């Protein structure tokens, strides 16, 4: 192959793979081989964990609704009562929000779902109060209908995608179609001016002029890990305050009309992120073990606040250079391993180098890039899939090259 042709193919091929890489960064689904989790595991083994961000442990108050349920009758289309279903006690939610309205809270994440058709005597007052409050967000889900009385501007998506290969939570999508997630709506209100994720030309996303991605692999140990583990993938809340809704926050013991002394007053919420949700049942498998859903949402917000979704132009330029070099090697007469030992004259050194190089592949080289990037920036990018593509292209090219050479030799 002529040098000029080889250069052009290398430059164009590298550009195409760079665009493919960015598209994969934006995908709401984890890598096809669970590559992101592999990158974290490799970095942990090598003790190359990035520096953690400023702790938010003393800036949150967690309200657990797990023990505050009420039974709601369920009827069929004829009006026959089929039984009951437990829902979060909306009377206690209303009482808590009235208390919060008197405080100077920073933001409320109320990870409590109000499904269409579930009706209680408190709904009118509760939803009117939610509409009247500032800096409060409630989840919606693609698989269920939200109560139509909830103002749409006070809701955000709280879903994520998995694959057959990887069923655990890995990546959080900040925007799906035109629907913004809970963390993104929080970021729009609390982040720097004009903070949001905007789509351009069907592929590219920006945040206030910065190239970014709409989906991020969450580094769950952000903020000094709001949860810790007992060694068996069971979590417990660490370095943060968690209270039950009825007993601790409202002073209302369960199954009784008696009043107790609440542990919290209006001043307890001043300047705090108030996270309301079920910390016992609403748990999800992650690469760090089980995590409660409300804290996943908060971690996703912190990732935005610290620019984890931003994609550095310098990083893309470095990646483009790496891809170009790998394409140049791929299009050579020799395979990657042979190219790396070419030019070594000392037979002992050459043999030793060949042994080491025999373990090297395109996938391994790009995995090293992933680990170094995570170590230096705290951001996880899946380049291992691109490494697999390089390997496939290399095998196809050299197989075709060998076939052509054999045919030429036969003609001679």
Specify the residue positions occupied by each region the protein language model found.
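Juxtamembrane interface at the cytosolic side of transmembrane helices
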Residues: 325-364, 369-375, 401-406
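Flexible inter-domain connectors and hinge/loop segments
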Residues: 2-323, 391-412
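Loop-to-transmembrane alpha-helix initiation sites
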Residues: 375-388
């Amino acid at each position: 192959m002529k040098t000029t042709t080889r250069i052009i193919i290398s430059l164009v091929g590298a550009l195409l793979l760079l665009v493919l890489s960015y598209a994969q960064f934006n995908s709401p689904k984890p890598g096809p081989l669970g590559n992101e989790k592999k990158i974290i595991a490799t970095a942990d083994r090598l003790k190359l964990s990035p520096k953690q961000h400023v702790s938010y442990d003393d800036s949150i108050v967690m309200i657990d609704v797990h023990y505050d349920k009420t039974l709601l009758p369920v009827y069929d289309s004829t009006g026959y009562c089929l039984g009951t279903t437990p829902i979060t006690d909306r009377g206690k939610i209303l009482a808590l929000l009235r208390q919060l309205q008197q405080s100077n809270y920073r933001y409320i994440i109320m990870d409590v779902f109000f499904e269409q058709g579930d009706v209680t005597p408190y709904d009118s007052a509760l939803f009117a109060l939610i509409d009247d409050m500032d800096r409060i967000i409630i989840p919606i889900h693609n698989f269920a209908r939200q109560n139509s009385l909830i103002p749409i501007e006070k809701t955000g998506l709280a879903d994520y995608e998995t694959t057959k290969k990887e069923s655990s939570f890995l990546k959080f999508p900040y925007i799906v179609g035109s629907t913004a997630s809970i963390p993104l709506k929080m970021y729009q209100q609390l982040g720097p001016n004009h903070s949001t994720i905007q789509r351009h030309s069907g592929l590219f996303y920006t945040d206030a002029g910065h190239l970014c991605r709409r989906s991020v692999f969450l580094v769950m140990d952000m903020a000094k890990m709001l949860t810790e583990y007992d060694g068996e993938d069971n979590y417990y809340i660490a370095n943060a305050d968690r209270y039950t809704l009825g007993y601790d926050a409202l002073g209302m013991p369960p199954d009784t009309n008696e009043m107790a002394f609440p542990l919290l007053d209006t001043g307890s919420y001043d300047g705090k992120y108030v996270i309301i949700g079920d910390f016992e049942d609403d748990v999800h498998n992650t690469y760090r073990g089980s995590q409660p859903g409300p804290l996943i949402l908060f971690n996703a917000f912190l990732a935005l606040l610290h620019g984890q979704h931003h994609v550095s132009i310098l990083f893309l330029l470095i990646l483009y250079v790496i891809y170009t070099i790998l394409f140049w090697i791929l299009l050579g007469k020799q395979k990657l391993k042979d190219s790396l030992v070419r030019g070594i004259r000392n037979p002992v050194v050459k043999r030793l180098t060949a042994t080491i190089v025999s373990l090297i592949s395109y996938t391994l080289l790009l995995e090293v890039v992933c680990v170094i990037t995570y170590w230096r920036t705290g951001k996880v990018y899946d380049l291992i899939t691109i490494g697999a593509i390089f390997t496939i292209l290399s095998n196809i090219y050299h197989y075709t090259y060998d076939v052509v050479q054999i045919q030429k030799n036969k003609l001679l």
